[in-house]
Amino acid sequence: MSNLLVFDNSVVTDEALVANIMAQNQGASHQLLERIGTQVQLPANTYASIQVFTKSPQPVTLPASLLETLSGALAPGGALFGAVDGSQVMDFIMAGLAQDGDKWVKPAATGTTLLKKSGGGPKKFAFKRASPATAAPSTNGTNPAATVNLNSVVTLSMDDDDLMDEDDLMEDDTNLSMPIKIPAKCDPGPGKKRRKACKDCTCGLKEMEEQAKDAQLAAQNTVTLSAEDTAEIDFTVQGKTGGCGSCALGDAFRCDGCPYLGLPPFKPGEAVSIGGASDL
């Protein structure tokens, strides 16, 4: 890998300075800073080092795009240094360079190792009963060897993949509908008002209260019709009206099942004959 010398305009105007720099870096390539990226394209991953030169006492501020070009031209592990502006820390980092003293180094590529699985499927762990053994004696030799109690060893195996159905853990519906037995301490006795269930009631009193409340709501939602409500409505009597209230106005205002379909309009209280028979 070769080295690259980058000169700005202030350096190339001094031929003696250029000759001196080239003599100290024999075999190195050189480019004009202002031509890189516009008129000259640098090869990628080629240079072991890139050194920037200027005659100005101030360091050279490199644009972010030029930094990316120089970083791409560096070989992995190569360094950029010289008259560069060290305050451009974020620009150097964004270009993929890491600071190493007064140099900015392109990190070397690291290989990736893929781990291969052995076997076709996932392994299952099994814990088997330990064989009779004795513990090692202590280093001071005062404690006797302790024997392993085989009765206390638990054998676990993950080969059994059977899962328990959670529905099997529930009792039958017949058991859920069994009457709730209230403990004696929660029963106030005959003639006394029963107290309310506790917040964290476990004796069944809370369930009884909920059942009573549900029964009360069901009774409230039941509609009971009296004989007056279910009596057949006589549309010829003053004040009596049907569901639509328009039977006396004629067929245009009568329902499909109205018994007066086909009859002319009539006045309330008027005797109306249906099928030759009077309704009086």
Swiss-Prot record:
Region (Fe-S binding site B): 244-258
Biological processes annotated in GO: cellular response to oxidative stress; iron-sulfur cluster assembly; negative regulation of hydrogen peroxide-mediated programmed cell death; negative regulation of nitric oxide biosynthetic process
One cellular component (GO) term of this entry: cytosolic [4Fe-4S] assembly targeting complex
InterPro entries in the record: Anamorsin, CIAPIN1, Dre2_N
Motif annotated as Cx2C motif 1, chain positions: 244-247
Positions that bind [2Fe-2S] cluster: 186, 198, 201, 203
Annotated region described as N-terminal SAM-like domain, given as residue ranges: 1-121
Highest taxon above the source species: Eukaryota
Pfam family, one: DRE2_N
Residue segments, region Linker: 122-176
Keyword list, A-Z: 2Fe-2S, 4Fe-4S, Cytoplasm, Iron, Iron-sulfur, Metal-binding, Mitochondrion
Residues the entry annotates as binding [4Fe-4S] cluster: 244, 247, 255, 258
Subcellular location: Cytoplasm; Mitochondrion intermembrane space
Disulfide bond sites: none
Cofactor or coenzyme needed: [2Fe-2S] cluster; [4Fe-4S] cluster
Single GO molecular function: 2 iron, 2 sulfur cluster binding
Region annotation (Fe-S binding site A) ranges: 186-203
Chain location of the short sequence motif Cx2C motif 2 per the record: 255-258
Function field: Component of the cytosolic iron-sulfur (Fe-S) protein assembly (CIA) machinery required for the maturation of extramitochondrial Fe-S proteins. Part of an electron transfer chain functioning in an early step of cytosolic Fe-S biogenesis, facilitating the de novo assembly of a [4Fe-4S] cluster on the scaffold complex CFD1-NBP35. Electrons are transferred to DRE2 from NADPH via the FAD- and FMN-containing protein TAH18.
Domain notes: The C-terminal domain binds 2 Fe-S clusters but is otherwise mostly in an intrinsically disordered conformation. The N-terminal domain has structural similarity with S-adenosyl-L-methionine-dependent methyltransferases, but does not bind S-adenosyl-L-methionine. It is required for correct assembly of the 2 Fe-S clusters.
Quaternary structure, from the entry: Monomer. Interacts with TAH18. Interacts with MIA40.
Assigned protein family: Belongs to the anamorsin family.
Protein name per UniProt: Fe-S cluster assembly protein DRE2
Organism for this UniProt entry: Yarrowia lipolytica (strain CLIB 122 / E 150) (Yeast)
